[in-house]
Amino acid sequence: MDLLNTLVDKGLRRETPTREEALAVLVTSDDDLLDVVAAAGKVRRHWFGRRVKLNYLVNLKSGLCPEDCSYCSQRLGSKAEILKYTWLKPDQASAAAAAGVSGGAKRVCLVASGRGPTDRDVDRVSDTIKAIKEQNESVEVCACLGLLSDGQAERLREAGADAYNHNLNTSESTYGDITTTHTYADRVDTVNKAHAAGLSACSGLIAGMGESDEDLVDVVFSLRELDPDSVPVNFLIPMEGTPLAKEWHLTPQRCLRILAMTRFVCPDVEVRIAGGREVHLRTMQPLALHLANSIFLGDYLTSEGQAGHADLELIADAGFEVEGAGEVTLPEHRASVRGGGCGSHEGGGACGSHDGADGDAGCGSHAGGGVCAPAPAATTPRPAEEPRTDLVAVRRRGAGTDLAPNA
């Protein structure tokens, strides 16, 4: 397929695909799916070999968030029966992090519900970061505390944080449909604050909220322009008690296409399969490792994940290897200049240098030779054949409980 050859060539050179090419990946047929995975896999292996980075989530403060994000079980007014607790103490968080590290995690992600941290909260998290680093100096620590105020990113970095996560989640044009208590611009501002403070920026998306193909392409191109080092791709976990509990639009094949498109648009970035991996990819998880080079180990913030040992078996059985603590995740050109990778290299097709980063465009069919025809009108996503509610389980172990964590 000429389209895939073009995308591989561009990915190996870090050139930006067109929006038409990106959308074309999302509308490939099931007959072409393995070809799509193989093509994106060439790009993944070129930049990241066969390594898989393991990340481990520690939910520092769960539930009772004042924001109204419709996808979130911790949102204002959520009726989801999740764990609710206030801030973990540094020694509790450090113990939870140690479980993930012993299970093979290279990065620990410290997450707290809420609009954003107060200065006292930053002090609290700083103490937690120091406790984790004292226990294991080599572990990477990523903070995810919501919207940042001036100076807070710098304080987190001084405390030892390596990265900061704040996802864009969806396209700017549809952001108001999922959240009304803050704006898309607020999120962009926080990612930029992390960049400016010298933290490795991490920002991604959520697929499966009823968005169109154009929305997915739009948010991934916006992420490319923001230039994070890590792009987590979440697949919506429709939790009972949230407004999106009935949104079951994803199939394993759809998830693979989304991951492949993300890899083609962000070829040299850590693409992480995040929440919803087990629920939506299911038995196709091994194929997804040919597209992404990073996953979360064990459980998520409020829902259970696959058993930690099963994650390790998945990686080994698929012919991949866990990235070691001494290995550098990012390609040399990105790792050498933190925050200056994807958009800072030479060449007119550089990541972040494309035209019309926020416009919508698409490609519905090919007119021979890989030429994209005009995009069709946006369509409502088709629901999966049967919602797999049996695969959604609320987390009842690990942080905030007396039970051992899943790592």
Swiss-Prot record:
Keyword Lyase attached: no
Q: Which domain of life is it from?
A: Bacteria
- The EC class name is transferase
User: Mind telling me which Gene3D superfamilies this protein's record contains?
Assistant: Aldolase class I (3.20.20.70)
Instruction: Return the PROSITE patterns for the record.
Output: RADICAL_SAM
Instruction: Quote the record's binding site residues for [4Fe-4S] cluster.
Output: 65, 69, 72
Q: What EC number(s) does its UniProt record assign?
A: 2.8.1.6
List UniProt keywords, sorted A-Z: 2Fe-2S, 4Fe-4S, Biotin biosynthesis, Iron, Iron-sulfur, Metal-binding, S-adenosyl-L-methionine, Transferase
Q: Which residues participate in [2Fe-2S] cluster binding?
A: 109, 142, 202, 272
User: Which family, according to UniProt?
Assistant: Belongs to the radical SAM superfamily. Biotin synthase family.
Q: What does this protein do?
A: Catalyzes the conversion of dethiobiotin (DTB) to biotin by the insertion of a sulfur atom into dethiobiotin via a radical-based mechanism.
How does this polypeptide assemble, per the annotation?
A: Homodimer.
**UniProt-recorded name of the protein:** Biotin synthase
Record organism = Streptomyces coelicolor (strain ATCC BAA-471 / A3(2) / M145)
Q: What taxonomic ancestry is recorded?
A: Bacteria, Bacillati, Actinomycetota, Actinomycetes, Kitasatosporales
